[in-house]
Amino acid sequence: MSDDKKLIDDSPIPDTPVIPAQLQVDAVIQVRCHKDIDCFNACCKNIDIMLTPYDIIRLKKRLGITSTEFLRLYTEPFEFGRNSVGGVKYKPKEGTNECQFVTEEGCSVYEDRPTACRYYPVGLLSTRRQDENFDRASYALVTEDHCHGHFEDRKLTIDEYREEQGLIDYDELGRGWRQLILKVKSAGPAIGNMSKTSLKFFFMAC
């Protein structure tokens, strides 16, 4: 099995639509999202969005509430991976899988939207070798039937796409959190599954 395929297979999301190939920042992709596209808002109707600590800070400031209030109203804890790594993700509108911030005009918190929303339909893949103390970033293309942005007549590099979507600061400020996730995951079965108390502390760190 190739390293690319193994990395995709290890994804916490089953049946992932990610194309199993690691791309670098100079890779050229074809994608464009805009209000006039026929799939506008489709990606916001079936969400599974993990949030970083920086995402939470941006959003709670945007909404004018505390972190505690934001976590209670807009998120839910979850575990992923073989070692039950903890995290928080968007809580959809009750009875649906739709984002609480989506409107007919688009995202109501667009300027402060989370990292995952900015990247879509590109995925950030962070890896860390056992003999290294830093993470390596690569990227993958996400192809889902509802997204027609891949058919738009525009090509750009992943680095250009990241800059366009305001991801440079998000990636830099989220690096410590990604390294923490990788460290917990790389500990493997030596630490066993995280206890309920450990998960609570992990959520607090997030």
Regions found by a protein language model. Name each.
Residues 1-42, 48-206:
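Short loop/turn segments that flank or connect secondary-structure elements
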